């Protein structure tokens, strides 16, 4: 399996579970927060979906400019967003080159350090996994008991 296929496969092994959890959130639970200081379920899902896409764009561009170009999302259906952002992120990941993954990106303004594309990809994956764990808690507290394993077999 080539590098880009491995990256996409690993991404989807986690994203498909994130999307499955998002499917369990009915619109009347979009505003659910487990604590006053928590993101709402809707905010959390949008954060997960858009963050990986943003990180992938930073790797593709080789600089922090995508952080400056955050677009407000007008779509309100989490399932539509999950499908759209997953497809857009996969399209970027499929095109990443070894050069882009090995290139050092100056992210001192965002993270206080320079990182390689590969290191940022790892950070993006860990960010997804971290927040997916949060999402499991939200969905359980909404009353769902039939939940997927944290990672899908690919």
UniProtKB/Swiss-Prot annotation:
Gene3D superfamilies found in the cross-reference section: dinb family like domain
Q: How does it assemble?
A: Homodimer.
GO terms of molecular function:
metal ion binding
Q: Where is the signal peptide?
A: none
Know the name of this protein?
Uncharacterized protein YjoA
- Look up and give the organism this protein is from: Bacillus subtilis (strain 168)
Query: Which InterPro entries does this chain map to?
Result: DinB (IPR007837), DinB/YfiT-like (IPR034660)
Q: Where does a divalent metal cation bind?
A: 47, 127, 131
Pfam families associated with the record: DinB (PF05163)
Q: Any idea which UniProt keywords this protein has?
A: Metal-binding, Phosphoprotein
Query: Which protein family is it in?
Result: Belongs to the DinB family.
**Chain positions found as Phosphotyrosine:** 150
